Structures are given as structure tokens and as C-alpha cells.
Amino acid sequence: MTDVTGAPADVLHTLFHSDQGGHEQVVLCQDRASGLKAVIALHSTALGPALGGTRFYPIANEAEAVADALNLARGMSYKNAMAGLEHGGGKAVIIGDPEQIKSEEL
């Protein structure tokens, strides 16, 4: 179950109306001290632990970041399965411009 307390309406709409891929978990993260805003999506762990990566990209808004993370995580599930790996799919999307956000934490 995903805790979406306080999530913006556009993010909730994306989560509940665009996720036809049956994701296991979606986590919205924010750390004000470091400036981190991120979405972590786990599509499937049916074959094993989720395997994926992180995208650090200047996405326009949180709803687009959620949609991006959902699509990328689903794609990782399919790629891992087709490669014969015993892993599911997951992906993290960090919202921000890596050229401008240069805190030590990030």
C-alpha cells in the first residue's frame, strides 16, 4: 500500500488512473535539507528483487515524474525477464536538474 498523504491532486490522478501495469509499490520521497524530491516505483518482484536504476532529470512536475517512474520500472521488469535474470523491475526518478542541484547529499 502506498502512503499518498499530502500528495498533490495531479500526482494522485496519475497514480490511480495511469497505473495499468499493476505496480507493487510507489514511494514519493522528499528531503528538504538536501533538496531531494524523488519517486521510487517497484513494478514486480515475482522473479526476484527489483533491479533498475536512477534517473536524475529536470522533469516539469511530480505527476510527470510518477508516470516516468511507472513506465521505466515496468520496462525493467520486462527487460530483466527477457534477459533470463531472476529479478523484477524498479526505478527511481529524482526530480531536478543535475546541472543546478549540487548539494553534497545529492
UniProtKB/Swiss-Prot annotation:
Catalyses which reaction(s)? L-valine + NAD(+) + H2O = 3-methyl-2-oxobutanoate + NH4(+) + NADH + H(+)
Q: What is the lineage of its organism?
A: Bacteria, Bacillati, Actinomycetota, Actinomycetes, Kitasatosporales
Give the pathway.
Amino-acid degradation; L-valine degradation
Q: List the disulfide bonds.
A: none
Name the Pfam families on file.
ELFV_dehydrog_N
For this chain, the family text in UniProt reads: Belongs to the Glu/Leu/Phe/Val dehydrogenases family.
Localization (cell):
Cytoplasm
Please give the GO cellular component terms listed in this UniProt entry. Answer: cytoplasm
Record InterPro entries: Aminoacid_DH-like_N_sf, Glu/Leu/Phe/Val/Trp_DH_dimer, Glu/Leu/Phe/Val_DH_AS, Glu/Phe/Leu/Val/Trp_DH_bac/arc
Question: Which residues constitute the catalytic centre?
Answer: 91
PROSITE patterns in the record, alphabetically? GLFV_DEHYDROGENASE (PS00074)
Q: Name one GO biological process term.
A: valine catabolic process
Identify this protein by name. Valine dehydrogenase
Entry EC number(s): 1.4.1.23
What organism is listed for this UniProt entry? Answer: Streptomyces ambofaciens
